[in-house]
């Protein structure tokens, strides 16, 4: 089980950053399923413990930040832009899709709670059998990410450069990263 090396886009490209995070979501969700198989064959050895630690770190830190990026910044901006576009049917469709994926966040958080408890035990060296929720988590999270990309992120063209810069700045702040006020994308936001 190997970690996925990845160079992420900068916060000046917030949609690309969110999509890159989805690649990591897919990777770590799959890895949780692979870990269950690995444990059956090799037990909770050092590699299994390290893998559990990495999955925990990703979904405990990056996962909640990603949902906050969407729920606090991207989704409200897209809702407002869709409503302002004057295309009421398209705005209703986009707002409905946003409502649905936000509901999925709650379901995914519940699945994560079960998977998390199991991973914490594996990290401590206990070769516990994976809960049924691991397979559901490993399938549902990547499907959710694909849905967001196909039904929501594709509408990022509704946003202005200033709105995207504001989203990127808020993503940076959420992660404790310093924004350069001389950067025109940041200064205009």
Residue ranges, per PLM feature:
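Small-residue-biased structural context
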Residues: 1-189
């Amino acid at each position: 089980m190997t970690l996925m090396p990845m160079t992420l886009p900068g916060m000046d490209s917030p949609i690309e950053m969110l999509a890159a995070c989805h690649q990591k979501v897919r990777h770590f969700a799959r890895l949780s399923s692979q870990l269950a198989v690995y444990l059956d064959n090799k037990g909770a050895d050092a590699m299994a413990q390290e893998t559990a630690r990495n999955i925990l770190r990703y979904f405990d830190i990056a996962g909640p930040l990603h949902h906050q990026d969407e729920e606090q910044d991207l989704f409200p901006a897209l809702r407002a832009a869709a409503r302002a576009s004057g295309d009421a049917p398209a705005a209703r469709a986009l707002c409905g899709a946003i409502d649905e994926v936000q509901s999925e966040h709650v379901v995914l958080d519940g699945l994560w709670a079960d998977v998390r408890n199991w991973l914490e035990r594996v990290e401590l060296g206990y070769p516990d059998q994976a809960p049924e929720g691991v397979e559901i988590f490993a399938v549902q999270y990547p499907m959710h990410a694909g849905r967001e990309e196909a039904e929501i992120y594709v509408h990022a063209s509704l946003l202005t450069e200033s709105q995207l810069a504001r989203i990127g700045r808020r993503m940076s702040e959420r992660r404790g990263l310093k924004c350069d006020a001389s950067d025109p994308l940041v200064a205009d936001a």
